[in-house]
Amino acid sequence: MLTWFLFYFSEISCDPPPEVKNARKPYYSLPIVPGTVLRYTCSPSYRLIGEKAIFCISENQVHATWDKAPPICESVNKTISCSDPIVPGGFMNKGSKAPFRHGDSVTFTCKANFTMKGSKTVWCQANEMWGPTALPVCESDFPLECPSLPTIHNGHHTGQHVDQFVAGLSVTYSCEPGYLLTGKKTIKCLSSGDWDGVIPTCKEAQCEHPGKFPNGQVKEPLSLQVGTTVYFSCNEGYQLQGQPSSQCVIVEQKAIWTKKPVCKEILCPPPPPVRNGSHTGSFSENVPYGSTVTYTCDPSPEKGVSFTLIGEKTINCTTGSQKTGIWSGPAPYCVLSTSAVLCLQPKIKRGQILSILKDSYSYNDTVAFSCEPGFTLKGNRSIRCNAHGTWEPPVPVCEKGCQAPPKIINGQKEDSYLLNFDPGTSIRYSCDPGYLLVGEDTIHCTPEGKWTPITPQCTVAECKPVGPHLFKRPQNQFIRTAVNSSCDEGFQLSESAYQLCQGTIPWFIEIRLCKEITCPPPPVIHNGTHTWSSSEDVPYGTVVTYMCYPGPEEGVKFKLIGEQTIHCTSDSRGRGSWSSPAPLCKLSLPAVQCTDVHVENGVKLTDNKAPYFYNDSVMFKCDDGYILSGSSQIRCKANNTWDPEKPLCKKEGCEPMRVHGLPDDSHIKLVKRTCQNGYQLTGYTYEKCQNAENGTWFKKIEVCTVILCQPPPKIANGGHTGMMAKHFLYGNEVSYECDEGFYLLGEKSLQCVNDSKGHGSWSGPPPQCLQSSPLTHCPDPEVKHGYKLNKTHSAFSHNDIVHFVCNQGFIMNGSHLIRCHTNNTWLPGVPTCIRKASLGCQSPSTIPNGNHTGGSIARFPPGMSVMYSCYQGFLMAGEARLICTHEGTWSQPPPFCKEVNCSFPEDTNGIQKGFQPGKTYRFGATVTLECEDGYTLEGSPQSQCQDDSQWNPPLALCKYRRWSTIPLICGISVGSALIILMSVGFCMILKHRESNYYTKTRPKEGALHLETREVYSIDPYNPAS
């Protein structure tokens, strides 16, 4: 545990205390100022050695240090003890008694007139020494002399000629030869007047008894004094190593024997091994002297073979003249007793035999093999001829691994991450969904390091549609994307449709759609018009013609500036745009000038001044007290006159008045007004006027107010859109709707109009909401770029169904079946036919040893074809013509070119010299043929391999030449008829044999009997091997 006290001494501090192993770490805080006390405690099972407390002190008020080293913690061991500690000039405190065990402490006190130096308390440590500090020293306050030292028997010391032994003087003892010093060699005179140690003694030196000598004997010595010699000898089976004697000598104050010899066991090397046999000894360890080893032969290795032991069956481990282990005799050997076993010479393709070549081999003969460059040996490199006349293990094979097989487009193969494959390995190919495998799905690696058969290909599978098109891209499905899609002129690529196709794995094809390019309505021009009358977008290619309006009056006309016709085309981004800006209609004016004009009692409101040109206008205002008579604005016409005539400012005045009754003789002037559309005449207002000319008179003015309709009629089982409105002005429209379960009969919408009297009224009677089904008549549905498969008439009744089909090159968006509903509409809506993008094919694959007519064309339109051809010396396998389909794929895989080879027939049916049946020759190779003796060459002796795998000229024949004496025999005249008959018969037989020399199978006439004289090639790229 830690107890600490803190006293503050400015900023002076001690370093962190050292850690004590196996002690609890004392607690402290920084800085550690002088006066801090740390106390250590040990962990359980450990004993504290030293003072438990250390103090942080500062002697010079500049630096602070710990007053002592920390204690140590040692594991408790009561078997350890320490000798009695002696401190000259001092004594142990009471309570300290021997024996002193591990962890015991002793505290010393100095005698009077002595001062202690060092730690007064020490502990018995695990090393049986007192510590952790040295024993204290009690120094005399008044130094004293030590007494004279006595002499010792058989020894002497360095102080024999010293008169006084003062404090600090040291004396060293030594012994006579043959004696050893016992005790402290050097003692020192202390200030207390005492020697710091006991006087040593000299004892006669003797060696210990040599004891027993392992595996040998010792000749007993007469004494054990220094100089005595002992002798050693070994038992049988052991050999003395070292000197045979040892002497007692003194080394470093000890009497010891010089190096003794040892008796090493005599061992024989491991017994010799015997081929085809064994022994009872060890094959790796040495064998002790006297051991016996027995040899036996191996059992019969195989049927018909046995081993016989030749020589001594047992041998013993003994010694020779050099006392080393040797065997009593040579090891026997086992001889094989075999019958006449022979193995035929083994054959290996693509390799050779490294051993001596023989026609046959004897039992246990071995043969080693190697392979041709580039091939690897599979199996054992060496084989043995066994007792059955066969080779074991089997003859190896030379084979070459295959490199990674080629990848296929739109497909994958097994183990695609591997780069090398062992012979015999098979790889399976498969195609992506939407593609079909053409060829074998599995290829195999041959020992020649080639893949066979040829790699398959994945061709585009024909999509067998399942269900309708989808206009939203399917998620997490395989989709065969459309490539090289394009649209006809006037269309641009837009969104895609997706068709589910039949297959083991669901897959889709993408169908790119074409959107018709349209332009916005042609621009409107001032003072002119154009030939397009609709407000909808304009189809691509449409031509619009512009025209100007006639002149506003005689002598004035509009002139067209710009292109009269523009057409709808497309910009660089494929968007619809007009071929050029719209033209302008500008007024063509004559040289017109109107005279200046003034109005008496009035002023001009416009700022322009004379001269005035065509269509210039002038506005007038009368002075106060005057009323304008005529138009306030006049215009300069093309004939240099003002229209209308200039007005007058007359002095007269009128003021509105409320009329309750007018005088009977009143002069009333009616001012007529024309009410605008949507307004009606509802009354009059009066103004009282007075002037000098007419006196007092009255102006009657018509008043126009807006036309209002009454709220529209309500209907049963329905309502209209104006239910919340308060007023219904002229032109307002309301729509009627029926409640659910009712249908509307009559006009759906009513409009606020004026009747014959000019009052507001609704455009017709309100409709009705009826519950029974009405008579249904749906309009004839029309689909652009499509047609109906049924119902060609124009009227359709309730529940009639129409089936639509899109034209070739278009795809349907919507349902192909629609039904006539009771509300005279089609459900679902009438579909639309969207143009499909036309697909193109990418450049077809190139083939080794051949080419095609596609050249550098990057994209091929549907229907275009390419032709493949092979180089000279190669034949085409497959179709030469490929056609680009509307699906954007080629009609079939490309062909390949295989090398042209000519060969001799396998079955020659005769004897030939140097002829190899089945050997092949490359295109262009020429062979020279020669017949064996007894045959005659018929045909050309030289033939060349042609590009159709045929020889030209055909290979020559060797005709058998035999029975050349037949005519002579047949020409002999014989007197006897019997002899003549026999001769004739014999001649017929020989003639028959000449023309038809038979074997057991067929005539040999016409068979090849050739030998190849030489082979050369005219093709520099295909030299004959």
Swiss-Prot record:
The protein's role, per its UniProt record: Serves as a receptor for various ligands including complement component CD3d, HNRNPU OR IFNA1. When C3d is bound to antigens, attaches to C3d on B-cell surface and thereby facilitates the recognition and uptake of antigens by B-cells. This interaction enhances B-cell activation and subsequent immune responses. Forms a complex with several partners on the surface of B-cells including CD19, FCRL5 and CD81, to form the B-cell coreceptor complex that plays a crucial role in B-cell activation and signaling.
Taxonomy of the source species: Eukaryota, Metazoa, Chordata, Craniata, Vertebrata
Keywords, sorted A to Z: Cell membrane, Complement pathway, Disulfide bond, Glycoprotein, Immunity, Innate immunity, Membrane, Receptor, Repeat, Signal, Sushi, Transmembrane, Transmembrane helix
PANTHER family in the record: PROTEIN CBR-CLEC-78
Outcome of gene disruption: CR2-deficient mice fail to mount an inflammatory response when compared with wild-type mice.
Name of the featured protein: Complement receptor type 2
Disulfide bonds: C14-C56, C42-C73, C82-C124, C110-C138, C146-C189, C175-C202, C207-C248, C234-C263, C268-C317, C297-C334, C343-C385, C371-C398, C402-C445, C431-C458, C463-C501, C487-C514, C519-C568, C548-C585, C594-C636, C622-C649, C654-C689, C675-C704, C709-C752, C738-C769, C778-C820, C806-C833, C841-C884, C870-C897, C902-C945, C931-C958
Transmembrane segments: 964-990
Tissue: B-lymphocytes.
Subunit record text: Interacts (via Sushi domain 1 and 2) with C3. Interacts with CD19. Part of a complex composed of CD19, CR2/CD21, CD81 and IFITM1/CD225 in the membrane of mature B-cells. Interacts (via Sushi domain 1 and 2) with FCER2 (via the C-terminus). Interacts with CD23. Interacts with FCRL5. Interacts with CR1. Interacts with INFNA1.
Any GO BP annotation: innate immune response
Gene: Cr2
Organism expressing this protein natively: Mus musculus
UniProt-listed Gene3D superfamilies: Complement Module, domain 1
Alphabetized CDD domains for the sequence: CCP
Domain Sushi: 12-75, 80-140, 144-204, 205-265, 266-336, 341-400, 401-460, 461-516, 517-587, 592-651, 652-706, 707-771, 776-835, 839-899, 900-960
